UniProtKB/Swiss-Prot annotation:
Name of the protein described by the UniProt record: Histone H3
Post-translational modification: Acetylation is generally linked to gene activation. Can be acetylated to form H3K9ac, H3K14ac, H3K18ac and H3K23ac. H3K9ac could compete with H3K9me and prevent gene silencing. H3K9ac is restricted to euchromatin.
A single Gene Ontology CC term: nucleus
Keywords on record: Acetylation, Chromosome, DNA-binding, Methylation, Nucleosome core, Nucleus, Phosphoprotein
Taxonomic source organism: Griffithsia japonica (Red alga)
Amino acid sequence: MARTKQTARKSTGGKAPRKQLATKAARKSAPASGGVKKPHRFRPGTVALREIRRFQKSTELLVRKLPFQRLVREIAQDFKSDLRFQSSAVLALQEAAEAYMVGLFEDTNLCAIHAKRVTIMPKDIQLARRIRGERT
């Protein structure tokens, strides 16, 4: 069926508004629960979808730089003490780590969808890593 253009139509009167009963009017004018307004809440999933769109658009690093740097230094300490890192080296490690994690979560999400679920679980991560050949 072809779409047609809608044009504005002039109102032709209609019904006149009826007067409300006294109790209804009093109930509507008085604020609910002593004037305390509830904070606005979005429906479940709305904020999650908004965050997904925002993070897919962005290119900035998602893990904070200093905590990641401390983690790198802590892991490197097991191999050799008093190691020094150039800032560009830590940045390259962080880029690689985040790219790996994003890819792993994409594959994990596919595993969850394949199982007819929308929630990812540890078994999805294990399956994704096993298919990739990272873990036997």
